[in-house]
Amino acid sequence: MEQVAKFSFPSELTSSPSGEKIAWAMNEQGKRNIYFAEGPDFLPKKMTPFMNDDGQEISSLQFSPDGNWLVFVRGGDHGGGNASSTVNAENLTLLPKVEIWKINLSTGVLTQVMEADSPVVGFPARLIFLKGGQIWETDLNSAEKPKQLFEVKGTVNGMQFSPDGKQLAFTVNRGSHSILGVFKDSATPIRWMEASFHRDSNPQWSPDGKSIAFIRTLGGKGAAFPLLEPRHNPWEIWVADLATGKGKELWKSPETLRGSYYNPFLTFATADKIIFESYQDGWQHLYSLSLSDQKVTALTPGNYMVEQIKLSADSKKLTFSANTGDSPQDLDRRHIGSIDLAYNKLNWETSGTGIEAYPVWVGNTGKMAFFSATAQRSHLIALKEGANTKLLQEDLIPSDFPQKSLVTPRQVSFRAPDGTTVYGQIFEKEGGAAKKPGVIFAHGGPQRQMLLGWSYMDYYSNTYSINQYLAELGFVVLSVNYRLGIGYGYEFHRPANGYHQGAVEYQDIKAGGEYLANLAQVNGDKIGIYGGSYGGFLTSLALARDSDLFKVGVDIHGVHDLDGRYDLPETYEVAPDYEKAKKVAWESSPISDLASWTSPVLFIHSDDDRNVNVSQTADLIRRFEELKMPYESILIPGDTHHWMKWENMVRVDQATADFLKKHLMD
């Protein structure tokens, strides 16, 4: 297990606005460092000296507009709640800090800026960030201490410098509403752009700095509508004139469930063209919006989704990843696309059996960099120029990493009882026993998609390595892409009666277990299941409802009690189906079916989990003990949901595999 878990994983890939400079972070068995490369040779250079598996994340990596500096945050867990709260996965007697650092690319000197978070760099080398909820500033070229820029009430988000770096747009959440402000200098009061009782977000400057586009959604709480009936969540695109502060609506979402708001991409391409993302046709796609006539043009039509969208520095091109290509199997892959915005011309930059993600343009050179993986090789940074692509840092693949022995997952599909087509990937090594034990893997999220190769997310690259290890041991593993996940359209992503409203997605997991049990090479009496987070919830649900099918399971930081998804009513007015909704949430929870849970289980949780509170597992274990039900458990003190310390991750991986092997093989 340790060998296959030695994969290095990149993150934070970024490029300078001009020139040929790229940078990224690399996690090498818990040792996280920043690498820098510059054209024409693009030879990677390590820029940081962090040599310990200490659980300290690197995030917010970015170049200064002049390309002379790199800025990043070290510490925290920015994939969970309380992102700026320190992580002490090593259980040190002095807590680590969440700090902003800068790197002078001319000298290589690494300097701490301040204990703070959320940096944003403006032209030419102006740095702002959040400290104590307020905005501070400094100049990267200066040795002077940072100072607070101004004070404002509320929670600050969406900080964006104007193109000339002289003004700052931001939003402030004040509970019932959010407003868009512009700061110029300490002598000028903050100007509020088209302030209203709505929630304004995602401010984006026009290229000429004369206007700001933003997204507007409803404010307040509104009436107590039924909780179990899906409702349209409207949103609008507005633009505010900087000179007057007045705004106007440019576009309003269709009044359909598909048209609902879900935090889409938004940017200016030209002074008259806005690019935005919408689910309105049933798939996550890009659209252009003309300011002059409000005409909307679809840029990426087809039955696939786009994500990880990046605009070029000159605003002439977009790039993104998508699950489409020449083969039906590309539905479970990612390839890179691009759009020439002058002609709205769509091009596909990559194809084949690999996984490519997180593309960035390299300045205005036409080159691009992105994550690249296969079914066997984990992600590295790739550089593409024209038809030629080269990999960077192949030397980081450990000599004992079992790349050549890893299997290629194969795509399968099956039907749930209600007729829904469900996709998955089978991991199986050739040979071995005539009848092999089977394991279902349930991913977390749930807004995730497992792929026919290494995932572009570090958490799921780890679970991919577990699936490979289980296949090596002789298991047949089926990774199920159940409903609520992405990649298969809106209705699959947002089904009725999901999660606490009925857990309709569980039937996909059960159908996967039955599909696996009925394979000719699988022993149907030896089926196990494991999963983390939402997958932990589904694991416990499987064991509680169907112990006759799922003979053993490993529940990693799962959710077990959904009753708390609805707050207790504090006013006279409550949803007409409030009591029914509470009952459905209870019945959707694993704890409601403990009487039929007979299969062995291993519970694993860390106690600084910011995504699923450790109390979810503590409460379930208490219930087990009160009912005198057997279980095994592992508590990881100090770590988070994302196993920030590699040693802890490997311990969890090995324990998962050992528990399944003990009950299904030994």
What are these regions (language model features)?
Residues 2-32:
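Beta-strand-rich domains and repeat architectures in extracellular enzymes and scaffolds
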Residues 49-53, 248-264, 395-409:
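Surface-exposed loop and turn segments in beta-propeller and other repeat-based domains
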Residues 22, 67-70, 127, 168, ...:
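Hydrophobic beta-strand positions that form the internal "hydrophobic ladder"
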Residues 38-42, 104-108, 140-143, 184-188, ...:
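Short loop/turn segments that connect beta-strands within beta-propeller blades
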Residues 17-18, 65-66, 122-123, 163-164, ...:
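Residue-level detector of Asp-centered blade-edge/turn motifs that repeat once per structural unit
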Residues 25-35, 51-57, 73-101, 110-120, ...:
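A flexible loop/linker signature enriched in serine peptidases of the S9 family
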Residues 348, 357-666:
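Serine-hydrolase catalytic core recognition
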